[in-house]
């Protein structure tokens, strides 16, 4: 990977919020959730960009759906989730849905590029 290309990405920032353990009001809870949602949207948009790059790079349409890679991603996510204290009951279905939607997006991008 080109180090200079990697440094061109702006650092992800999350708006100021109260730590969940310190929240005393529902307004504080909602502000925290909203701040995290805005950050997640930015991350998901960037992830989508990588799916578009994959569609451009992959040599054939069959390469878009890679069952082995899906299971590798889920395993890595679950390991990271456990370290972060995120429940498997949230992490696994969220990522499986995310992967499914990203693959659908990648197929559409692949077809559009080769139209």
What is the role of each PLM region?
Residues 1-115:
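Domain-level signature for soluble enzymes in the chorismate/prephenate branch of the shikimate pathway
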